[in-house]
Amino acid sequence: MSRACELTGAKANNGMAVSHSHIRTKKLQQVNLQKRRLWWEEGKKWVNIKISTKALKSIQKVGLDKFAKSNGVDLKKF
C-alpha cells in the first residue's frame, strides 16, 4: 500500500534541502499518516483507515460521513 491518505489522496512532496552554503539537495517530504479506527455513524460500524493528520482534524470538525462525501470517497470499501 502506498504512503497516501485514503480520503484526501495526499502524498509525498518533492522539495529541496538547503544547506548553510546554499547547496540544494533533493528530499522527500512525507505526509503525516496515521492508522485510525473511526466510527462511521451512517454505516453503524468501525472503519480502519490510513489518514493524514490534516484530514483527521477536518473529520473532527465536520464529521466522517460529510468529509468522505465531499472528497468523493465511498466508505463501504473500508
Swiss-Prot record:
GO terms for molecular function: structural constituent of ribosome. SUPFAM superfamilies: L28p-like. One of its GO terms (biological process) is translation. It holds the Pfam family Ribosomal_L28. One of its GO terms (cellular component) is ribosome. Keywords: Ribonucleoprotein, Ribosomal protein. Gene3D superfamilies: Ribosomal protein L28/L24. Transmembrane segments: none annotated. Belongs to the bacterial ribosomal protein bL28 family. This is Large ribosomal subunit protein bL28. It comes from Prochlorococcus marinus (strain AS9601).
